[in-house]
Every structure is written in structure tokens, then in C-alpha cells.
Design a protein with these regions (language model features):
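Active-site flanking residues adjacent to catalytic metal/cofactor-binding acidic residues
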Residues: 11, 128, 166
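Short alpha-helix plus adjacent loop in nuclease-associated cores
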Residues: 128-143
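Conserved non-catalytic scaffold segment of RNase H-like nuclease domains
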Residues: 1-115, 121-124, 147, 151-162
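Short, charged, surface-exposed loops that flank catalytic or proteolytic processing sites
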Residues: 158, 162-164, 183-188
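Acidic two-metal-ion nuclease catalytic site recognized across multiple nuclease folds
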Residues: 2-3, 152, 172-204
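A charged, well-structured terminal subsegment
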Residues: 160-177
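Non-catalytic, well-ordered alpha-helical scaffold segments
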Residues: 108, 128-131, 169-172
Length: 204
């Protein structure tokens, strides 16, 4: 089912991290989910959301606080990861709307953490790697970070870099620039999944 207006969820996550190796037994976990809703029909960023997520198997390090601005107290006040995924599905229609992120890190982190916790993956199959689309559209040799991409596009960095809600907002601005260039892929219909290996192919 496709929503009227062509809404797109832009997602950016921040996770527990360390300068060097993680402490024994600790794993990187999502502590913030930034979400901006883009109306591809009107070319506007229409909603900005933030979910804080309490880590269960790690703690926010001083290095992580310096990078993201989030403290252990901030993260501990958040919802559990499973509840965060439920909110994404229930309030933001994550399973129905197409979604995008800057690179594939966010998608892979959700996949890993859902598998590790037995949580239902909240998103549908229509994911777009905005970094890859931007790189191709601007003819760049290397895929840029978000801040560099904003400079290439001549756009300001709004808010704080490595804050999920602000990064999602800025990524959404880059996506709207790609829409204006006619470079953003058509997400109005679900993508066909490739057939299983060995399946007969239809000859057209």
C-alpha cells in the first residue's frame, strides 16, 4: 500500500561506540533514532522525530558522548529497542513507507540488533542508499560523508552533526536536492524481490 503524497521516512541512528575496542561483553547498540518524513510530492520536509533508545548490553562512553552529545543518562531514559521498533511500525508506518538512510550502516545495524534481540524488523523492502544515489548524481569518485555532501550541494548543516534527529533532517535536504535533479529513484511501487537461485526465469 502506498500513501497519498509519496511520503518517505529518512532514518539516521546513533549507537554506542568507543575509541578503540569495546569493553568485554559490550556490543554496539542503537541509542538514538532520528526520523524525518519527506513529502516527495510537495518537495518538503514535513515531520521531524527523535527516539531515544536505552542500551541493554553496553553503556554510553565518554567518546560517544563527545561525538553525539548523548550521555548514559539520556540513553537510559529512552525506550527499549523492541518498543522503539514497535513505535516505528505503528506511528511512522515503517513497514509500509519507503525509507532511506545515508549509506547502509543504519539498515545493517537494525538487522543485526533485531536478530540479536528477537525483534521483528520494522521496515519494508523499499530502502534507498541516499549516499550511493548522491555519489552517482554528482559524478563523484568516492562516496562522501553527509557533511561533505552538504558542502558539495551548497546546503547548510542544520543542527549538530552526529545527532540522529539533525542528521536525518539534513539527509532529507540532500534527498530533496536529488529529487529536483530527477535523480531520486521512483519508490511509488514495491520493488520486486529477485527470484530464489535456480528458479526458472521468464523470457520476454
Amino acid at each position: 500500500m502506498t500513501e497519498p503524497g509519496g511520503l518517505l521516512n529518512v532514518i539516521d541512528v546513533e549507537a554506542t561506540c568507543w575509541e578503540g575496542q569495546p569493553p568485554p561483553g559490550a556490543v554496539s547498540e542503537i541509542i538514538e533514532i532520528g526520523l524525518t518524513v519527506v513529502d516527495l510530492g510537495t518537495g518538503e520536509r514535513v515531520e521531524k522525530h527523535r527516539l531515544l533508545v536505552a542500551p541493554a548490553r553496553s553503556a554510553v562512553s565518554p567518546f560517544c558522548t563527545e561525538l553525539t552529545g548523548l550521555t548514559q543518562e539520556d540513553a537510559a531514559a529512552g525506550v527499549g529497542f523492541t518498543e522503539a521498533c514497535r513505535i516505528l511500525a505503528a506511528r511512522h508506518r515503517a513497514g509500509e513507507r519507503p525509507w532511506a538512510s545515508w549509506g547502509d550502516y543504519d539498515r545493517h545495524q537494525f538487522t543485526r540488533q533485531c536478530r540479536a534481540t528477537g525483534t521483528t524488523y520494522p521496515f519494508g523492502h523499499r530502502h534507498t542508499n541516499a549516499k550511493a544515489v548522491f555519489t552517482d548524481a554528482h559524478g563523484l569518485r568516492k562516496r562522501p560523508g553527509m557533511a561533505q555532501a552538504l558542502r558539495v550541494a551548497g546546503l547548510p548543516l542544520e543542527g549538530r552533526h552526529h545527532r540522529g534527529e539533525d542528521d536525518a533532517w539534513n539527509i532529507a535536504a540532500l534527498i530533496l536536492g536529488l529529487v529536483e535533479r530527477g535523480a531520486w529513484p521512483d519508490l511509488s511501487a514495491p520493488r520486486r524481490q529477485p527470484p530464489p537461485p535456480g528458479s526458472p526465469r521468464r523470457v520476454v
